[in-house]
Amino acid sequence: MSGKVATKKKKIDQTEIEEDYSLNDVVLRGRVSQEAIEKELPSGDKVVEFRLIITREKLSGVDTLDIGAWSSKARRIALTLTPDEWIEVSGSIHRRFWSAPTGLASRWQVEAVEITRI
């Protein structure tokens, strides 16, 4: 007898799972630029939008960022904000697309998950 052992080889579908280290998490502190505006979209969804003024570190000037409150809790809080009020917003950055008269349009917006007065 030879020392060989007969074995059946099973073909196994091995799909490599690649790790995804993505993170879309922002925390911003700044002043509310003006009163928030509630909009109803063609889909029926509601969003409350406002802008946050953030002073640049070590540079002159400010950045004004668009904030969107989509959840009912965030919308309620956003509608009570007053101009120049200091707040903290936590959430994530999203790019919104819509059809405009000139074609497809888009803009970046911070989707507020939590809004806190400071």
List the predicted regions and their residue ranges.
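Single-stranded nucleic acid-binding surfaces, predominantly the OB-fold ssDNA-binding core
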Residues: 2-118
